[in-house]
Structures are given as C-alpha cells and as structure tokens.
C-alpha cells in the first residue's frame, strides 16, 4: 500500500487532469456547459500547479522504467500547465459564440496537456511516443476549433501529414537504436556508453540519433523544417495559438534536453554537433530576416518564434560536455519566450473577438493598429511584452540575450556572437514595427473606431497585468532568478 501511495504521488497532477475529463463527460448536456467546463478545467489545472509547487519542496527524484520525475520535470510541467490555464481562461468568450460544439475544446486542451506532461516525464521511448501522439492529435482539433477558413483547414491538414511523417522518422530512429543497444529505457544509455564507448560510433546508432533529432527539429519548426509553421500562425485563431505556440515547444524541448543529457557522447560526433550548430544558427538568421517581408502580424510572430527556438538551441549546443540542466541562462530565456507568447496571443484573442462580434472579419489583420488609443492598458502591456521579446535594453529580454552573448564570449564563440548580434538587430526592427502600429491613430469607419469598449473579465485583466508586472520587475532585477 505504501509503495502504491509513493507511486501515485509523483503522477497525481496527471490523475487530477484525467479525473476532470471524466467530470466533463457528465456536464456535456448541461445548459451552462461552457461555464461549467471552464470552471472544472481551470480548477483542475490550477490545483495541479499548486500541488507541484508544494511537492517540489519535499520531493526530489522518482524513477521507473517508464517515467522519471525530478526538479527539471517540475519546472517544465508548471510552464505547460500555466499555458493550458491561460488557454482555458481566454477561450471562454470564444466558446460562448459556438452553437453546438464548445465544451469539447476543454477535452482537447486537457488531453494535450496530459500528453505534454507524459513527454516531460518520459524515461522510455514507449512513454515518449504515447505522449507525443496524445499531445499532437488533440492539437489538430484545437487549431481548427474557432475557424472555418479553408486556408486554415489546408494548413492543418498539411501539418498533420508532416507530423505523421516526423513521428514515423522518430520510430525509425528508435528502432535503429534498439537494434544496436537492445534497450529503450533512457536510464540505461549512460551505462551502455560508459562500458561500451565504441557503440556511439556505430553507423546504425548515429543514423538512429539523426532520425530522432530530425523529428524533434520538425516539431520545434527549426530551419529548414519550418515550412508548415508560418501558415499555422497566420490562419489559426489567437486563442488556439496561446496553447500551440507554447505547449508544443515546452514539451518537445524538455525531451530534447533529456535526450541530450542521456546521450552526452553526441558531442563527440563532430558531424552531428556541427549539424545541430548550423541548424540553430540558420534558424536565428532565417526567422529574423524573413520576418522583415511579412505583412501579417501572426505570421511574423511565427517566423520570430523560429529565431527564439534557435536561441534556445544555441544555449544547449555551446555548453558541450559541461551541459547542466536549467541553468540561469536557459531559465531566463525560456521564461521570456513562453510568457511573451502567452501574453501576446492572449491580448490578440481579446481584440479579435470584438471583430467577430462586430462582423469585421476582413479587418482582423489591422486589429492591433491604434490599440493604445482605445485601450491604453492593453497597449502598454503589449508594448512591454514585445520589447522584452525583442531584447530591448532595460527589459527582461535584454538580460536574457545579454547573458547568452556573455556565455558565447566565455566559450570563445566570437564569430557566432557577432553574427547573432547582427541578426538580433534585424529581429528588433520586426518587433518595433508591431509596437509602432500600436500607437498609430486607429482607423475609423462611419465615425466609429474599429474596436470600442473592449470587454475584459477581471481574471483576464489580473493575468495580463501580472505578466506585464513580472516583465518590468524582472527587467530591473534579473538576478531574482
């Protein structure tokens, strides 16, 4: 009984989310099913966050053949749950507009969240693949939930086909690794490489590792495997993008870190090392430079996210043998990226729903123009978020990139530092372009501004102001981390 209790403690947040899914089945025919579903989902996610924060102080490590939970896992699970929480809160107004299928959105979010948490705590290729499929299949429904656009449907179908192909590559890589090592549990690989170091140079092992990395880079939309990503960002609803743009990155990046930790000898294979290095560099350059020619704001953010993921990959690849999980540098930059995207798409979803209600769908691309003039608070919050993402001086984003440059110089990556700095200047121009549009006088039709009297709930205001407050305080005091 004690053993069973000890096994349940670490996975209790997942069990809590599963229980909330069961409750949702009982309120499918409720008259206020959207409100009830939102309450059930947000409460379960909120208490999962509280539980993890509480147990994090006493619980250190739990390991079995299928899962491994440590302080590193707790950090990523909290980020994933926060992303899900914001998605549920800011999707509520959109779901009220749906006639028939509305509460199903919460099913998708909960299932994807459970899948993401399985990826984060996976210690076996079986649990990893189960988590990946559980994460990505419901996301297809999330992306298409608030849109009937053919372009959106086409981009999702394209993403689905390519995602299936990347999952097949992952399985192919796993099969080659299993053929060479005879193991699927990650915990055994450091021992195998320690006692049989020559196995890492086996051609089938190298091919298997390359296939797995290729699959992960596709799911992270790194260059040149990014072609599906901009269309998803452009045609999907901002409310869906709160979850998609953050949850996928958190989950897959957490596994990539764990994978590189259990396969430390990858750095000895120069070909793989240089390929990862070039992919990260080209991602930073490509995302910033191609963003210049974009006219759609969401598509621009999609390209800039490629650049940000490239930054995170550079942090990892330049640490080589001294790689340490969750150092201050990685925490700061990941925090900026995740909360920046959550804040941006949360504000965008509030604005866009007013266009839907006023039947101004054709004008949604101009929804950020003049935001400051009809809602100064949202305009200022959006400016703070975008300035932080750009790395503007005296913001949290500036310190994140400053620490990256300092780290690269210490590792003697001088040319890399110079190239990234030049690329970052271009990226800053892209963010300033969006910020500039916030302060342009809003367009008027029939003497009426595009959006007047934005409705924002008290909870939504609190969450957005909290993000802005965190960015400002941590911008002045970055060493709080």
UniProtKB/Swiss-Prot annotation:
Belongs to the complex I subunit 2 family. It is a multi-pass membrane protein. Its main location: membrane. This is NADH-quinone oxidoreductase subunit N. One of its GO terms (molecular function) is quinone binding. It comes from Buchnera aphidicola subsp. Cinara cedri (strain Cc). It catalyses: a quinone + NADH + 5 H(+)(in) = a quinol + NAD(+) + 4 H(+)(out). One of its GO terms (cellular component) is plasma membrane. The gene is nuoN. The lineage of its organism: Bacteria, Pseudomonadati, Pseudomonadota, Gammaproteobacteria, Enterobacterales. Keywords: Cell membrane, Membrane, NAD, Quinone, Translocase, Transmembrane, Transmembrane helix, Transport, Ubiquinone. One of its GO terms (biological process) is ATP synthesis coupled electron transport. NDH-1 is composed of 13 different subunits. Subunits NuoA, H, J, K, L, M, N constitute the membrane sector of the complex. Its EC number is 7.1.1.-.
